[in-house]
A protein has these predicted regions:
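DNA major-groove recognition helix of helix-turn-helix/homeodomain DNA-binding modules
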Residues: 49-65
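Short alpha-helical DNA-recognition segment
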Residues: 20-37
Length: 75
């Protein structure tokens, strides 16, 4: 199981690889940009499953991929 910091890193790397800004992803996922920022930086104690699934959907990622791959292997 990955930590929130590791999950946040995966999300940030994928977002950057797609050339998307935090505000764009957050808006499409229906969450505040500040919430996504805190998640990507590992500065949140919790990030609900609905939020996570919404963000992953925007980025074209699936939960099983994120949970079984390390943050360094997004290619």
């Amino acid at each position: 199981m990955q930590t929130l910091l590791e999950l946040g890193n995966v999300v940030a790397q994928k977002r950057r690889a797609l050339g998307l800004k935090q505000g764009e992803v957050a808006n499409r996922a229906g969450i505040p940009q500040a919430t996504l920022s805190r998640f990507e930086l590992g500065k949140t104690a919790e990030f609900g499953s609905r939020k996570l699934l919404a963000v992953l959907s925007v980025l074209g990622l699936e939960i099983d991929y994120v949970l079984t791959n390390s943050a360094g292997s997004l290619d």
